[in-house]
């Protein structure tokens, strides 16, 4: 238990409004904290909370010595500038790994907090014995949260990396070169077997509800399953690894 360490890791979670998906994620993170012995405090703020009020709360937590990690649940209401809020969090308490300082450290190969979903994917590949070095790695999606840090981490592991996106010409031609395909495109079951090279490793970052209200990802699992050598399911694939890496960042914040 973390409580047996010299310092107690207290992680503060801030949620503005009542976005249903955000509430599920916050609940899962709260359970994970309790399981490993991290003390966590939730701030559930009203939808009408102003940007200035949120900045003031974060600044207060930045200067609270016993708080080692601060997490602001995204997305935020439209009237709040997410970039400003992310920049307000102290880089040393930015356990999500979104602050520009930590993003810069990642690209420079320096030590810092790494965005949790990409970090979890790297650990998943390593644990599964999948070689990254020298492999053709294609990331579909260029978001600051998944796509860009994913590319940086794959480069760090000596993968040959291509980042595809909505403006990529002939996406299927690009993805069919991939030994490792990371789908973070944000479209329900978009990636079918025709996008996949025989024997490719497929990592599905998406999380959606299909027409039957079942959870599914960016990859059409049933269509791709027989073509891939390994594939992550939704749910139960990338999601748990994301939370595990968040817990790892929290522990690191307390130790540092």
Residue ranges and their predicted role:
Residues 72-132:
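Anion-binding alpha/beta catalytic cores of soluble intermediary-metabolism enzymes, centered on
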Residues 85-90, 94, 99, 103, ...:
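Rossmann-fold NAD(P)-binding glycine/threonine-rich loop
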Residues 11, 33-47, 161-163:
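Short beta-strand elements in bilobed, periplasmic/extracellular small-molecule ligand-binding domains
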Residues 1-10:
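Single conserved hydrophobic/aromatic residue that forms the stacking wall/gate
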Residues 53-65:
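Short, well-structured alpha-helical segments in soluble
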Residues 15, 71-75, 140, 246:
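Short beta-strand segments
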Residues 66-76, 80-84, 177-210:
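Glycine-rich phosphate-binding loop
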Residues 16-30, 112-201, 214-222:
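Glycine-rich phosphate/diphosphate-binding loop of Rossmann-like nucleotide-binding domains
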